[in-house]
A protein has these predicted regions:
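N-terminal helix-loop segment corresponding to the beta1-alpha1 unit
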Residues: 1-168, 172
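A short, hydrophobic C-terminal helix/tail in secreted or cell-surface proteins
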Residues: 173-179
Length: 179
C-alpha cells in the first residue's frame, strides 16, 4: 500500500507509476481544494489530473485536525510507502518525526521530494520545476541560437524526479529485508 500526500507532478508521478504496476495507492488530498494538479487545466479539463490520478483511490483529509491526525496515523501504520513533497521540516513541525513514523510503522519507506533537497542552503525555499530547469542550465541548452533560455513545454524536472523516485523504490531493499 502506498500513501501519497504529495501535490503536483513529482510525487504524483511516483504514485502513478506504482499504481500502474498494481500498487494500492491512497492519494490524500486537502479538503475543498484537492491536489493543486486539479487546477492545471486546458479548456477547463485537467488532463494532468486524469493521467496522474488513474488507478488511485482518493481521500479528502484535513491532517491538521485531531480526527485527521488519527486517520492519517492509521493509514501510516498499514502503508508500505509514504510519499510527500512538503517544504523540508513541515512534517516535523506537524509532529511527524522519524521517531513517530518508526513507532507507527518501522518498515515504512518514506519518499521525500523537495526542489532543493532536505538539507542545504535552499532547503526552506519552495522548489518548482521551472526554477530547477533554469538554475541547472537545462533551459539555456534548448531553443534557438538567438533566443533566450527556453523552458520545456511540460513538467520535465518533476517527471524526472518522479521517475528517479520510483526507480529508487524499485531498487531499494525493503526495511523488512535489512539486518
Amino acid at each position: 500500500r502506498v500513501l501519497d500526500l504529495s501535490r503536483l507532478a513529482a510525487g504524483n508521478m511516483i504514485s502513478h507509476m506504482l499504481a500502474d504496476h498494481g500498487a494500492d495507492v491512497i492519494k490524500v488530498e486537502r479538503p475543498e481544494k484537492g491536489d493543486d494538479l486539479r487546477t492545471w487545466k486546458v479548456n477547463n479539463i485537467s488532463h494532468w489530473w486524469h493521467v496522474y490520478s488513474r488507478n488511485k483511490r482518493s481521500l479528502s483529509l484535513n491532517i491538521k485536525t485531531k480526527k485527521g491526525t488519527e486517520i492519517l496515523k492509521k493509514l501510516i501504520s498499514t502503508a508500505d510507502v509514504f510519499i510527500e513533497n512538503f517544504v523540508p521540516g513541515t512534517l516535523e513541525k506537524w509532529g511527524y518525526t522519524k521517531k513517530v513514523f518508526d513507532s507507527l510503522n518501522p518498515n515504512l519507506i518514506i519518499v521525500r521530494i523537495s526542489g532543493w533537497g532536505q538539507t542545504g542552503l535552499y532547503k526552506n525555499f519552495p522548489g518548482y520545476g521551472s526554477l530547477v530547469e533554469g538554475m541547472s542550465g537545462f533551459a539555456s541548452m534548448t531553443g534557438e541560437e538567438n533566443q533566450g533560455p527556453l523552458l520545456p513545454p511540460t513538467a520535465l524536472a518533476d517527471m524526472i524526479s518522479g521517475l528517479s523516485g520510483v526507480c529508487l523504490l524499485y531498487t531499494s531493499p525493503s526495511p523488512r529485508d535489512l539486518p
